[in-house]
A protein has these predicted regions:
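Conserved SAM/SAH cofactor-binding pocket of Class I
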Residues: 98-207
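Conserved Class I SAM-dependent methyltransferase catalytic core
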Residues: 225-285
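Conserved hydrophobic residues forming the short capping helix/wall of the S-adenosyl-L-methionine
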Residues: 14, 110, 163, 238, ...
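Short loop/edge segments at beta-strand edges and connector loops
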Residues: 76, 176-177, 252, 274
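Conserved AdoMet
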Residues: 30-109
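Residue-level signal for inorganic ion chemistry
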Residues: 31, 69, 99, 133, ...
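Mobile active-site "lid"/loop adjacent to the S-adenosyl-L-methionine
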Residues: 199-229
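Non-catalytic accessory regions of SAM-dependent methyltransferases
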Residues: 1-43, 51
């Protein structure tokens, strides 16, 4: 079977699933390249290349995994985030474009502050998962030192490997902690606290795409009946841990604008930023 034939067959298999139809061609091509260890250019250059039996078997196995709604990122073990390649496993939430907007918002706030200050920025990433936020901020803010916390030891292992991959281990420290609970009081003076916490109401579980509902870590998604269990703990902790005028940056869910604004009443400069679908997605506020 040639590359072209294998790709056509896999695309048809994936397209037969209503949950996978929209991205069937893209996913088939990604899986083919991953199975063969070839680039996109190599795939296009020789579509009539014949697959060996071992290559065909490897490709078929990946397609079968995808047909169970296993996310493409878990199959390939990779996801790009803010221009950086990250390792991902089922232990971590797959980084999403909405969280790139959170990073962009923090960078916009901090770059001027960094220029105006001779001191390094101290940043805390709460619920770091793959390390995406911590790594992107450290990469783009060369004078920043980041503490990244997570309750999951498996997630922290993934995050640490990603920091090493991007040569950032000297400026990112990973700590096992339930929110800020494990951080000593003398460390609680951050310039920025950023977080993409769990915020999906448990009642919304059935409405999630099967690949999210069935494969991504529930602890990184769900936050009680209304989705605010983590926010209610995190926001007071963040206020105590920020320096005066320090920045809190949170990703929020659809329909959570008013409740988040209420939880952040008493903070300064509250702003809610919309995503590309005009849904409020990022909350920014300054400690009084």
């Amino acid at each position: 079977m040639t590359l072209r034939e294998a790709l056509t067959r896999a695309t048809r298999q994936l397209a037969a699933s209503p949950d996978l139809r929209a991205d069937a061609a893209r996913d088939a091509a990604l899986l083919l390249r991953h199975a063969l260890g070839i680039s996109h250019a190599a795939q296009l250059a020789d579509p009539e290349r014949t697959l060996t039996p071992a290559q065909q078997a490897a490709f078929d196995a990946l397609v079968q995994r995808r047909l169970t709604n296993d996310p493409i990122q878990y199959i390939t073990g990779e996801q790009e985030f803010y221009g950086l390649a990250l390792r991902v496993t089922p232990a971590v939430l797959i980084p999403r474009p909405e969280t790139e907007q959170l990073v962009e918002a923090v960078l916009n706030e901090m770059k001027q502050a960094e220029l105006d200050s001779k001191q390094s920025l101290r940043i805390l990433d709460v619920g770091t998962g793959s390390g995406a936020i911590a790594i992107a901020l450290a990469h783009h803010l060369p004078h920043a030192h980041v503490t990244a916390v997570d309750l999951s030891a498996a997630a922290l292992e993934v995050a640490a490997s990603n920091a090493a991959r991007h040569a950032l281990t000297d400026r990112i420290r990973f700590v096992a902690s339930d929110l800020l609970d494990a951080l000593p009081p003398d460390e609680l003076h951050f310039d920025v606290i950023a977080s993409n916490p769990p915020y999906v109401p448990t009642a919304d579980r059935a409405s999630l795409h099967p690949q999210v509902r069935e494969h991504e870590p529930a602890a990184a998604l769900f936050a009680g009946p209304d989705g605010f269990d983590v926010y209610r703990r995190l926001i007071p902790q963040a206020r105590a841990a920020l320096r005066p005028n320090g920045l809190l940056a949170l990703e929020i869910g659809q329909g959570q604008r008013e409740a988040i604004a209420s939880l952040l009443s008493g903070w300064n400069e509250l702003r809610l930023l919309d995503d590309l679908q005009q849904i409020p997605r990022i909350a920014l506020a300054r400690k009084p």
